[in-house]
Curated annotation (Swiss-Prot):
Organism classification: Bacteria, Pseudomonadati, Pseudomonadota, Alphaproteobacteria, Hyphomicrobiales
Originating species: Rhizobium etli (strain ATCC 51251 / DSM 11541 / JCM 21823 / NBRC 15573 / CFN 42)
InterPro entries assigned to the protein according to its UniProt record, in alphabetical order: PyrdxlP-dep_Trfase, PyrdxlP-dep_Trfase_major, PyrdxlP-dep_Trfase_small, Ser_HO-MeTrfase, Ser_HO-MeTrfase-like, Ser_HO-MeTrfase_PLP_BS, SHMT-like_dom
Underlying gene: glyA
Gene3D superfamilies: Aspartate Aminotransferase, domain 1, Type I PLP-dependent aspartate aminotransferase-like (Major domain)
GO cellular component terms given for this protein: cytosol
Protein name as catalogued: Serine hydroxymethyltransferase
Length: 432
């Protein structure tokens, strides 16, 4: 490379080098600014997190752990990882944290690698009751490599059937019991799960990927000291970059998890992401994060109450956390049709199966809604009640139209109201 081309490589902007990608990013920024984000697993990160994630830390390979790397030149990325570890430990009140998992699936796989052998039995919440793919779905590695015993919710009230958990644990003697899910809107009884795990000699693993921000903010009971290990993603209610964390109080387990992450599952960690995790943990340690977590729950409850008043069923009758499942059958709608219609009205959500759902997984009878992203924008109860009424308006219009194409007039009217709302709560002004 000539001096001129080298200078160009280091200094040309994305807009100059790749206008197609630059354009796609610009359009996505517009979508995020003007639409209401209700996907429960999504959030909006701070400028500080974005800057760390987009930093030159991405250039550095750092196989191993701080102070024990297989590459030279790691003295500064060590600072970032050590900060991430210490802040995660402080945030959740634990003795050990591994901040290297690249995703939620990989953090859970690392725990399996550390605690299970192929063919061993573990228990997890059934996907149809609000569990996760990695909790034993037959299409996932967890369901292919291990003997999975699933538990679920009761058909009457859609609450966890703890008697079923105890009965199946006694019958199948699992090595691991997973508590936690992706679409359960009530408080988890960690103490009862630990009692059941102890009764059969199982490890209790808590996947708190969805509720970790609420745990950190004091709005949901901590799984510690009840669990042996907890895993969480960092990009949902924690409001950080995409990635995972493994937490424990037990040194012998911490060593197993470290070995499982590296070299068991991953090679070089993503140091720019770890730096961004450290920033997000630092933000979550501030007093205002507790206010944020409390507002999430208030907003979710306001939304659920509004939807119920509008003639919709909310699974289990409401929510204690950041999310809810909405049963659409009273509106003669499916999750697939509702997701599309709401999307056309600039309200983003995801179709989701409800417990004992008669519809196919790609159709579903429900949608899942969450409050974290809207709360980050500054929405409070009044805005979420307005959003709830807009959702009812779209679904009522869909019912009248009785067409997959929706009700264009209603959706256009709601779309205008959504833009008026989001314009009052701007984001990333510095991006122009």
């Amino acid at each position: 490379m000539t001096n001129a081309s080298t200078e160009s490589f280091f200094n040309r902007s994305l807009a100059d080098v790749d206008p197609e990608i630059f354009g796609a990013i610009g359009k996505e920024l517009g979508r995020q600014r003007h639409e209401i984000e209700l996907i429960a697993s999504e959030n909006i990160v701070s400028r500080a997190v974005l800057e760390a994630q987009g930093s030159i830390m991405t250039n550095k390979y750092a196989e191993g752990y701080p102070g024990k790397r297989y590459y030279g030149g790691c003295q500064f990325v060590d600072i970032a990882e050590e900060l991430a570890i210490e802040r995660a430990k402080k945030l959740f009140g634990v003795n050990f944290a591994n901040v290297q998992p690249n995703s939620g699936s990989q953090m859970n796989q690392a725990v399996f690698l550390a605690l299970l052998q192929p063919g061993d039995t573990f228990m997890g919440l059934d996907l149809n009751s609000g569990g996760h793919l990695t909790h034993g779905s037959p299409v996932n590695m967890s369901g292919k490599w291990f003997n999975v015993v699933s538990y679920g919710v009761r058909e009457g009230d859609n609450l966890l059937d703890m008697d079923e958990v105890a009965r199946k644990a006694e019958e199948h003697k699992p090595k691991v019991i997973i508590a936690g899910g992706t679409a359960y809107s009530r408080i988890w009884d960690w103490k009862r799960f630990r009692e059941i795990a102890d009764s059969v000699g199982a490890y209790l693993m808590v996947d708190m990927a969805h509720i970790a921000g609420l745990v950190a903010g004091g709005q949901h009971p901590s799984p510690f000291p009840h669990c042996h290990v907890a895993t969480t993603t960092t990009h949902k209610s924690l409001r950080g970059p995409r990635g995972g964390v493994i937490l424990t109080n037990e040194e012998d387990l911490a060593k197993k998890f470290n070995s499982a992450v590296f070299p068991g599952l991953q090679g070089g960690p993503l140091m720019h992401i770890i730096a961004a995790k450290a920033v997000a943990f630092g933000e979550a340690l501030q007093p205002e994060f507790k206010e944020y977590a409390a507002q999430i729950v208030k907003n979710a409850r306001a939304l659920a109450e509004t939807l119920i008043a509008g003639g919709l069923d909310v699974v289990s009758g409401g929510t204690d956390n950041h999310l809810m499942l909405v049963d659409l059958r009273k509106k003669n709608a499916t999750g697939k049709r509702a997701e599309a219609a709401l999307g056309r009205a600039y309200i983003t959500c995801n179709k989701n199966g409800i417990p004992f759902d008669p519809e196919k997984p790609f159709v579903t009878s429900g949608v899942r809604l969450g409050a974290p992203a809207g709360t980050t924008r500054g929405f409070k109860e009044a805005e979420f009640r307005e959003i709830g009424n807009l959702i009812v308006e779209v679904l009522d219009g869909l019912k009248v139209a009785n067409s997959d194409d929706g009700n264009a007039a209603v959706e256009a009217a709601v779309r205008g109201k959504v833009v008026n709302l989001t314009d009052r709560f701007p984001m990333y002004d510095y991006m122009g």
